[in-house]
Design a protein with these regions (language model features):
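Transmembrane beta-barrel wall of Gram-negative outer-membrane proteins
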Residues: 1-13, 17-37
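Outer-membrane beta-barrel channels and translocator barrels
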Residues: 36-39, 93-97, 169-171, 199-203
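Transmembrane beta-strands of outer-membrane beta-barrel proteins
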Residues: 41-45, 100-104, 174-176, 192, ...
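Surface-exposed extracellular loop regions of Gram-negative outer-membrane beta-barrel proteins
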Residues: 49-53, 58, 110-115, 119, ...
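Outer-membrane beta-barrel transmembrane domain signature of Gram-negative proteins
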Residues: 15-28, 47, 59-173
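Solvent-exposed, glycine/polar-rich loop segments of beta-barrel outer-membrane systems
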Residues: 2-10, 62-69, 122-127, 222, ...
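Feature captures outer-membrane beta-barrel proteins of Gram-negative bacteria and organelles
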Residues: 160-162, 189-204
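Solvent-exposed loop/turn segments connecting transmembrane beta-strands
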Residues: 154, 158, 181-191, 213
Length: 238
């Protein structure tokens, strides 16, 4: 009750703030598959969106003193993704123990990410002094370090791959694959994979694989930003 972050006139016995989250997910997917000229194909288009909002209850903004509200809209996070995909495959006879399967595909992806700022009193520094912002979860601010962080961020990614899978003998399987990725914000890369499986005797198999990899940071990792202000010996520190 006597904590410097409390206002006894509002909570004479102290308080326990609560973080309430409201999450909404939306998605839609459509696809079609078939076979033509020996090629099996599968095409799809999908879209999804996630919205998470934060509402703080049983709290206060100490810097507004007894005039502080006790519930705050601290803002939220929004993410969406649109994905178009096409995969094809067919079996061909190269004279090995089994037919060789050739697979290929292409994909286009667009992503967006946005921070929704909280209401001003959820992060503001009021006239009464003390710890500013909603206690336990200050709202997202629209500007941090002189830069706006509430703008929608987006990027697109184009990729393609080809893969071969064959049984050289009844006991030896080999696989090889190439994949190309091109991100609008992070550049491009070409990766490969080789794998094999050898069964010297029935029921015993040896596997080995080697590959390279590439992973671009997510939009959330690049653009998520939040700021809180603390009162340390009468000095406000972000």
């Amino acid at each position: 009750a006597n904590d410097a972050r409390n206002v006894p006139a509002i909570y004479p016995n102290g308080f326990l703030p609560l973080i309430n989250t409201d999450t909404n997910d939306y998605s839609a997917t459509a696809g079609v598959r078939g076979e033509n000229g020996g090629w099996r194909w599968d095409a799809s288009l999908g879209w999804g969106r996630n919205e998470t909002d934060f509402r703080i209850t049983n709290s206060l903004n100490r810097s507004f003193g007894a005039a502080s509200q006790t519930e705050f809209d601290s803002g939220g996070l929004q993410y969406s993704q649109t994905l178009a995909n096409l995969d094809v495959s067919r079996d061909i006879n190269l004279g090995f123990a089994e037919k060789t399967t050739i697979s290929a595909g292409a994909e286009y992806r667009r992503e967006t990410f946005q921070i929704r700022p909280g209401e001003p009193n959820s992060y503001a520094n009021g006239p009464a002094g003390g710890a500013p912002g909603a206690q336990v979860f200050p709202g997202f601010q629209p500007v941090i370090g002189g830069q706006r962080v509430d703008q929608e961020r987006d990027r697109n990614n184009k990729s393609a791959y080809v893969e071969i899978d064959t049984d050289l003998t009844s006991r030896l399987n080999l696989q090889g694959a190439l994949r190309y990725e091109d991100y609008s914000d992070f550049g491009s890369d070409l990766n490969w994979k080789l794998a094999g499986r050898f069964e010297p005797i029935e029921g015993v198999a040896l596997r080995a694989s080697a590959s390279t990899g590439f992973r671009a940071p997510s939009l959330q990792q690049q653009f998520y930003a939040a700021q809180a202000t603390n009162n340390v010996n009468g000095i406000l520190l972000d």
